[in-house]
Amino acid sequence: MILLQTSLIWVVYAVVVVVLFAVASVFIYVYQSPRDRSPSVTLTCIVAITSLLATILLLPVDVALVSSTVSSSVGQRKDWATPEVVDRITFSLTLVYYILYSLDILLCLLVVPFVYFWYEEYDEVAAQTGEQSSGQRFWGASKYTLSFIAILIILFLVGVFVPISRANGGNGLDPFKSLLGENRGERALTFALGLLITIGMYVYALHTSTGLAVLPIRLIKGGPRLSNAGSWNATFTVQLDSNRERRRQLEGRCGGNFDHLSSKDRRELDALIREERTLIRRQRLAQEADGKGNALLPRMWFRLEAFFRPFRRLVGLILLLLVLLIWVSMILTASDKAKNSICKRHCGYVLGHINIFNPINEIFVQSAKLFPIDYAIFTMLVLLLFFGTVVGIATVGIRFLWISIFRIRLGHTSPQALLVMTAILMLSILALNYSISMIVAPQYATFGPQTFCDRLSGSSVLPELQCVVKRCSEAFGSDAAKKVCTPSVASTVLNRVTVSFPFFGAIFFWSQFAFIGVYLLALITSLLRSPKLDEQQLDEDAEEAEEEALLSGSRRNMDDRWQSIVGRASRSEDT
């Protein structure tokens, strides 16, 4: 029975990983630029995102497996749940976690940078003429990746030798002292994981919070578009008439011979010609938005958009309420940690017992009794936070200080930007792993629905009723709790980071308040600001579409000419 139960749980996880691979594939395909697709970049981004999402979505499997050893209704371990069986379950989970975390670190610090430089080293002309071989390209990418290999080695060496916290028992650290006894390999991985989560907290506090505020409001209000297409069309018509009138004046001044124009007038004429092309493109877009264009597909798209607009607003409203519920839950747990943490900054604000009701946490604890309902809810939560981060990155952009380096847009993201965005998403997902497990749903992520039977000393009631069923918690140090309760491996790994290196735990904790503040500021800004149409970007997109159409037309013409030449040659041979 136990083998069948655990096998089904792992089968559900395998199905979820396949779904994640499909989601990552569609996500990368939708965002990458069709003109600059690279198979190596696409595959790397898909594998990296799938690996990170698979790591965080292992948590419900972790909770389900450790919770399956306990009968929550009576607070006792099941007959088959011997210490050896429980140790075997936790060992297998620990092994999977360490493999996934190691893979995540290697992908983020080694594979993604190498593929980035591999793409940058490609010279199309040199490759076509045979002047650049794959070996030369590999060596060029490897030289630049050596710095990341050095960072990775230094990171693990520092993790091996850096001293861990040795807080005394007076700090209330007794329930967590077992976490300090890991070997040096675990210590190195713990330090590397803590450092990457720390970097990811910046992305989480800035981009994820901004995206979660912008995404629902954008669905409710609608994105920037040609909302009043009729007036836009009239405006563009007037501007186009004015442009052409000025061109006629200049052409009349020179009598059709442009050599007679001054350099100033020639520059003005060139500017008017460029402006005319821009206005014609804008006028065509406005006509399509107004349903007056000749193209069938754009007209159908705008009509479908108008039909689904009420449903989109309903989805936006539901997402807004859900994100606000998550935000309130984070405030409650963060306040609980700040007030009731057993050892405050000495152990990274670890919370031994939940003292303030958390609605999201309670939803997960109750749904965990009916696996995989909690898994479905957890997956939707993770995907919401993931796509919120994507929207935040697209809104803020990839910047260094105030300088914009890359822009993330649907169908217009370059391979370099795609790789950088993937690395940023990997860091943010690591930070999300901590926030969901320790802030959003701490009881669920640590013990799930596990309970234990707390014996009542000196009770006069029947022996089978001489106990009170309580939820498991680290704060309970009784023998009954220790014999029954098994913390999840995910919570053990994260608590090991915060207890062994309290400065990481302090950064993680205070980053939650930064997230809360940035979200509130971004939400107020999104509510007050109306979406604006980026005319410059609209012109660039239209120009790019025209170039693509011209290139496609040129390719078709060349193919037709080639087929015609081949046909004439074959007919000549027959003759």
From Swiss-Prot:
Annotated glycan sites: N233
Acidic residues: compositionally biased ranges: 537-549
Molecular function, one GO term: cobalamin binding
Keyword Transmembrane helix appears in the UniProt entry: yes
Location in or out of the cell: Lysosome membrane
Region annotation Disordered: where it falls in the sequence: 537-556
Membrane topology: Multi-pass membrane protein
Pfam families cross-referenced by the UniProt entry: LMBR1 (PF04791)
Keyword Signal annotated: no
Keywords: Cobalamin, Cobalt, Glycoprotein, Lysosome, Membrane, Transmembrane, Transmembrane helix, Transport
Membrane-spanning intervals of the chain: 8-28, 46-66, 95-115, 144-164, 188-208, 314-334, 376-396, 420-440, 504-524
UniProt xrefs under InterPro entries: LMBD1_LysCbl_Transport, LMBR1-like_membr_prot
Gene Ontology process terms (BP): protein localization to vacuole
Record's GO cellular component terms: vacuolar membrane
Family listed: Belongs to the LIMR family. LMBRD1 subfamily.
Role according to the record: Probable lysosomal cobalamin transporter. Required to export cobalamin from lysosomes allowing its conversion to cofactors.
Descriptive protein name: Probable lysosomal cobalamin transporter
